[in-house]
């Protein structure tokens, strides 16, 4: 189901709690909402649709990647950049890493570890910031 986008920083700044298999529908809602906003958005976190759970989706080269409880376990190549966010107005500066390795649960809630680089890594870092209540 396509959900409305939360645009209130006070709601976005609250850290999210771990997702469970009972939150699978939220993951599907994120996928649906990302597809509906594909012309203006490359990633979403659950708090952006009003759910304080650690769930993100990122538009990657092979298709949308859905992650439950993502954690960055390795990072290298810090750089400064600017980002926008569907939930916020304007562009803001932030620090990111060129390469990251993420531990997460996949759509079946099976544990996974995967490395990302470049823009895909940036999208995922932005989503994980949302999970941690960090607003760029």
Predicted regions and their residues:
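Positively charged
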Residues: 1-136
């Amino acid at each position: 189901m396509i959900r409305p986008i939360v645009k209130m920083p006070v709601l976005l700044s609250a850290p999210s709690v771990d997702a469970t298999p009972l939150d699978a529908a939220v993951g599907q809602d994120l996928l649906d909402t990302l597809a509906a906003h594909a012309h203006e958005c490359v990633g979403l976190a659950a708090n952006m649709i009003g759910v304080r759970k650690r769930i993100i989706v990122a538009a990657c080269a092979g298709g949308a990647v859905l992650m439950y409880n993502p954690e960055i376990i390795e990072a290298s190549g810090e750089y400064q950049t600017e980002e926008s966010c569907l939930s916020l107005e304007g562009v803001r500066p932030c620090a990111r890493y060129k390469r990251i390795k993420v531990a997460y649960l996949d759509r079946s809630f099976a544990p996974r570890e995967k490395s990302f680089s470049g823009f895909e890594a940036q999208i995922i870092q932005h989503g994980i910031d949302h999970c941690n209540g960090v607003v760029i």
